[in-house]
Amino acid sequence: MEIKFTIKQVVAVGIGAALFVVIGMINIPTPVPNTSIQLQYAVQALLSIIFGPIIGLLVGLIGHAIKDSLAGYGLWWTWIIASGLFGLVVGLFRKYVRVINGVFDWKDILIFNLIQLLANALVWGVLAPLGDVVIYQEAAEKVFAQGIVAGIANGVSVAIAGTLLLLAYAGTQTRAGSLKKD
């Protein structure tokens, strides 16, 4: 199976990964060690909805890997993969959110937020901590606490910033049937 990317998709991955890194350097601490509120997932969610699951996956994987490399504490693959999976899961449900058609009403906002909250709960509350226990032999209590806090924090930040980004994006799109012949 050969996957071909358009120039637009390649640029979206590059810009998305760069934004993931830059925005990811802003860490708002939480009471749980090594866990902070992260704002870059709102941008990743936006790109996942606009460009689909593969672009969302790549933005998370590449962006998080570069961010970890620059941070100096090494690559934490379980969380890098979780970031990619967040974009993948959100992107899989893009057809239910109509921003491409210039529509992002209450129904779309509700659907988007249900999707992203479930994706955050899955990747941060289950997959990342489980990976830490299995691969890195981390203490389950510690990593599940980190994962739950990260999932809640990311869910709230995407609910606010992601919704605002999608509202702004939908406003730039022409609604189907909105043009009339004079």
Swiss-Prot record:
Subcellular location: Cell membrane
Membrane topology: Multi-pass membrane protein
Any single GO CC term annotated in Swiss-Prot or TrEMBL for this entry: plasma membrane
Predominant location: membrane
Transmembrane spans: 10-30, 46-66, 73-93, 109-129, 148-168
Keyword terms of this UniProt record: Cell membrane, Membrane, Transmembrane, Transmembrane helix
InterPro entries: ECF_substrate-spec-like, UPF0397
Domain of life: Bacteria
Family, as annotated: Belongs to the UPF0397 family.
NCBIfam families: PRK13661.1 (NF010182)
Designated name of the protein: UPF0397 protein SPCG_0463
Source organism (scientific name): Streptococcus pneumoniae (strain CGSP14)
